[in-house]
A protein has these predicted regions:
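Helix-loop element at the rim of GNAT/NAT acetyltransferase active sites that forms part
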Residues: 1-12
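Conserved active-site alpha-helix within GNAT-family acetyltransferase domains
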Residues: 74, 78-79, 90, 103-121
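Conserved beta-strand segments that form the floor/walls of ligand-binding pockets within enzyme
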Residues: 36, 48, 62-66, 75, ...
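Acetyl-CoA-dependent GNAT
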Residues: 10-70, 81-82, 87, 142-146, ...
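Short hydrophobic/aromatic beta-strand or adjacent loop that forms the aromatic wall/cage
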Residues: 32, 134-138
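Conserved catalytic-core motifs of GNAT/GCN5-like acyltransferases
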Residues: 96-101, 113, 118-134
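Conserved GNAT acetyl-CoA-binding A-motif
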Residues: 81, 88-100
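Residue-level preference for beta-strand/loop junctions
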Residues: 59, 93, 133-135
Length: 155
């Protein structure tokens, strides 16, 4: 989907082929919600929610997003984020969305902050990129209008 420079800014392997993404979509698990952005039949971005399956974490999901370098800064990332957050808020009723991002990825951090994410932690030397250890930020967003548990299932 994207050149190695794009995946260098993620915690994924730098050379995922299209076959890997096709396989991931074919073997999609019930707790995963993938999304792709296309322009004229070309995949220019992908994103997804990975909902937690543990009972005490069922209110949360991990978010991941990647946009092709040539399409960054053109609203693709914002469109993917908007769609995922709408799904999380209005369809899954999730309270908490979490993500990790390299601390020097200013463009992504700006997008996440504009979508309501806040920094919760810094993981020192957490990721390996081009032979160097780099810090990772843990960011999260809480539902703007948290859903309530039904009275019969509240603790």
């Amino acid at each position: 989907m994207a050149p190695p420079e794009v995946f260098a800014n993620t915690l994924q392997l730098p050379y995922p082929g299209i076959e890997l993404w096709v396989e991931r979509l074919k073997n999609n698990k019930p707790n995963e919600s993938p999304l792709v952005a296309e322009v004229d039949g070309q995949i220019v971005g992908c994103a997804g929610l990975h909902r937690e399956i543990e009972v005490r974490r069922a209110h949360a999901a991990q978010l991941g997003i990647t946009v092709d370098l040539a399409w960054q800064g053109q609203g693709i990332g914002r469109a993917l984020m908007t769609a995922l957050l709408d799904t999380a808020d209005n369809w899954f009723g999730l309270l908490r969305i979490e993500l990790q991002v390299f601390a020097d990825n200013a463009r992504a951090i700006k997008l996440y902050e504009s979508c309501g994410f806040v920094q919760e932690a810094v993981l020192k030397s957490h990721g390996l990129r081009n032979g160097d250890y780099v810090d990772t930020l843990v960011m999260a967003r809480l539902h703007p209008k948290p859903p309530r548990l039904r009275p019969e299932i509240q603790p």
